[in-house]
């Protein structure tokens, strides 16, 4: 009986007196195959080599479509303006004018990017980037609009608070930090990041204190506006790969901001007074001061905003010029807040109902209870943001107790619960009702 070592070496000699060796994989002898490749301690025949090649070819062909898909240029999901506006309406209640303005601006922006691939080098018409400025009271949906747009178009998105930004060399975040966050949101895929959306919140907070030029440094106001100019318009900016400050020996990622859409938003408190005074001055006759006061209290006055008004508020002309699309949002009345509670796809009431559903319990809000939530939110004066804080305060105790309660199948929130004068109604498997947690 031959050993494994003897098998590997061979099994004797062939008719011509040559030593016969065996394939280490299939066991065929060299006299049965066309050729045999020798390794340090093994042999492989031509048949096994061909079989291996065929197996590898099949595996590579299965992987190849994915590899091709990865190598294809990234293209945002482009929808027409009507589709964008309708999709925004599923998440943002009201604000038709702002939704329409945003839909057109975003469509034109990404259509412009798409056209860059086939536009001729000698074409005299170059479509410039149109960044967007959203003006409206707090809690009216500015951030939600930007976030929903990014989700809809399937592009990277990041939110930056303008109040955290300072000029280079001062304590705080450089403007390059904005791009670092967008890179992180795109998993450091540079091509995706360069077609993303950046929402700069509280942009009104970087307005300088007056329209007059000051000799003192304003490191978080006009200085930040100046620093933002180049990335708003389009420039190649060196960004630290993991955020933070630059240092001389650090390797930077060059990000081209030419195709990044910037959406800036702010409440701009006091802007209505500036607009009211300007519009009143344009009128002829007595009572200009009285008319100015009337205009200031008009909720529609923000629609009359002009670039001169923005300059008087404290934004420098160069900065205003890089935000050519200005859209205003309306204050939310009680009807709008009521609809926000229940109508959007991700409405607050639906979110709480989903949480209760996980506990196999149905959550029901009576109509009067919802009306009470809206009244409290209006008194707080922070728009839709107040709705969540009101509901959290009411629901926290209920959600604390519910997982420990067995057999509960339904929970009803009444007006008395919202007012803090009653307990929710719990219905059990046997149909019995109990008004306590």
From Swiss-Prot:
Domain ClpX-type ZB: where? 11-64
Q: Which residues bind Zn(2+)?
A: 23, 26, 45, 48
Chain residues that bind ATP: 137-144
Biological process terms in GO annotation: cell division; proteolysis involved in protein catabolic process
Q: Does the keyword Metal-binding apply?
A: yes
Coiled coil (UniProt feature): none
Which top-level group of life is the source organism from? Answer: Bacteria
**Any idea which UniProt keywords this protein has?**
ATP-binding, Chaperone, Metal-binding, Nucleotide-binding, Zinc
- InterPro entries per the record? AAA+_ATPase, ATP-dep_Clp_protease_ClpX, ATPase_AAA_core, Clp_ATPase_C, Clp_protease_ATP-bd_su_ClpX, ClpX_bact, P-loop_NTPase, Znf_CppX_C4
Q: PANTHER family this protein is in?
A: ATP-DEPENDENT CLP PROTEASE ATP-BINDING SUBUNIT CLPX-LIKE, MITOCHONDRIAL, ATP-DEPENDENT CLP PROTEASE ATP-BINDING SUBUNIT CLPX-LIKE, MITOCHONDRIAL-RELATED
Q: Which family does it belong to?
A: Belongs to the ClpX chaperone family.
Q: What is this protein called?
A: ATP-dependent Clp protease ATP-binding subunit ClpX
Source organism? Chlorobium phaeobacteroides (strain BS1)
Starting at the broadest rank, the lineage of the source organism is:
Bacteria, Pseudomonadati, Chlorobiota, Chlorobiia, Chlorobiales
């Amino acid at each position: 009986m031959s050993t494994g070592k003897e098998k590997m070496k061979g099994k004797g000699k062939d008719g011509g007196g040559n030593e016969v060796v065996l394939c280490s994989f299939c066991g065929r002898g060299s006299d049965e195959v066309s050729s045999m490749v020798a390794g340090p301690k093994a042999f492989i025949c031509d048949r096994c080599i061909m079989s291996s090649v065929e197996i590898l070819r099949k595996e590579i062909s299965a992987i190849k479509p994915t590899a091709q898909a990865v190598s294809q240029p990234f293209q945002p999901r482009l929808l027409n303006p009507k589709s964008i506006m309708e999709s925004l309406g599923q998440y943002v209640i009201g604000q038709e004018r702002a939704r329409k303005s945003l839909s057109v601006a975003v469509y034109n922006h990404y259509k412009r990017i798409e056209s860059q691939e086939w536009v001729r080098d000698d074409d005299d018409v170059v479509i410039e980037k149109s960044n967007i400025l959203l003006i409206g009271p707090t809690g009216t949906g500015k951030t939600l609009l930007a976030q929903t747009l990014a989700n809809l178009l399937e592009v990277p998105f990041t939110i930056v608070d303008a109040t955290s930004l300072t000029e280079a060399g001062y304590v705080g975040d450089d403007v390059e930090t904005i791009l670092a966050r967008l890179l992180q949101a795109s998993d450091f895929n540079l091509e995706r990041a360069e077609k993303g959306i950046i929402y700069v919140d509280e942009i009104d907070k970087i307005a300088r204190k007056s329209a007059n030029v000051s000799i003192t440094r304003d490191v978080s106001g006009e200085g930040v506006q100046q620093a933002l100019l180049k990335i708003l318009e389009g420039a190649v900016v060196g960004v630290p790969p993991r955020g933070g400050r630059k240092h001389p020996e650090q390797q930077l990622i060059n990000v081209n901001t030419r195709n990044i859409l910037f959406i800036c938003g702010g409440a701009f408190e006091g802007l209505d007074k500036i607009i009211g005074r300007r519009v009143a001055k344009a009128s002829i006759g007595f009572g200009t001061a009285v008319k100015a006061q009337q205009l200031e209290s008009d909720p529609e006055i923000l629609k009359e905003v002009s670039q001169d008004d923005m300059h008087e508020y404290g934004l420098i002309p160069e900065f205003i010029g890089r935000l050519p699309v200005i859209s205003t949002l309306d204050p939310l009345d009680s009807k709008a807040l009521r609809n926000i509670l229940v109508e959007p796809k991700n409405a607050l009431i639906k979110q709480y109902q989903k949480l209760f559903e996980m506990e196999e319990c149905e959550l029901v809000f009576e109509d009067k209870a919802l009306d009470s939530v809206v009244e409290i939110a209006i008194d707080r004066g922070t728009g839709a943001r107040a709705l969540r804080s009101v509901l959290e305060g009411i629901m926290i105790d209920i959600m604390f107790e519910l997982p420990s309660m067995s057999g509960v199948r339904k929970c009803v929130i009444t007006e008395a619960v919202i007012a803090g004068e009653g307990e929710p109604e719990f219905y059990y498997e046997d149909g019995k009702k109990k008004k306590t947690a």
